[in-house]
Design a protein with these regions (language model features):
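Active-site-adjacent substrate-binding region
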Residues: 2-112
Length: 112
């Protein structure tokens, strides 16, 4: 989902609550690097995912960079038609999206 074509990464609420400082820095950096079309300033509802428990139980600030957008079909947030299906495989990896996320995270890590 971090490498799907036309991915959109909003600021997910659990990430904002527990790792907001890092989330804002990474999203700002993504925009600065020219990837604002991926790293959106919009807020998304909370997700229960691995980062939820790492934040709550281990108390390690962790954020989720995940394609999470409003579906034009259901008008609700979803992960795309490929999520948890046989279509969720390497064939849907979009190199420009993967470059945007990878370059943004690596630039942040090497410059923190």
């Amino acid at each position: 989902m971090v490498g799907a074509k036309n991915a959109v990464f909003p600021k997910e609420e659990i990430s904002r609550q527990y790792a907001g400082y890092y989330l804002n820095k990474i999203w700002k950096l993504g925009s600065y690097l020219g990837y604002g079309n991926y790293f959106k300033k919009k807020i998304a509802p909370p997700l229960t995912d691995d980062h939820t428990y790492i934040n709550k139980l281990a108390q390690i600030p962790t954020l989720d960079i995940i394609h999470y957008n409003i579906s034009s079909i259901t008008n609700r947030y979803d992960f795309g038609k490929f999520h948890h299906t046989h279509q969720d495989n390497l064939e849907i990896i979009h190199k420009p999206t993967l470059k945007a996320t990878g370059q943004t995270v690596l630039t942040y890590l090497y410059n923190m």
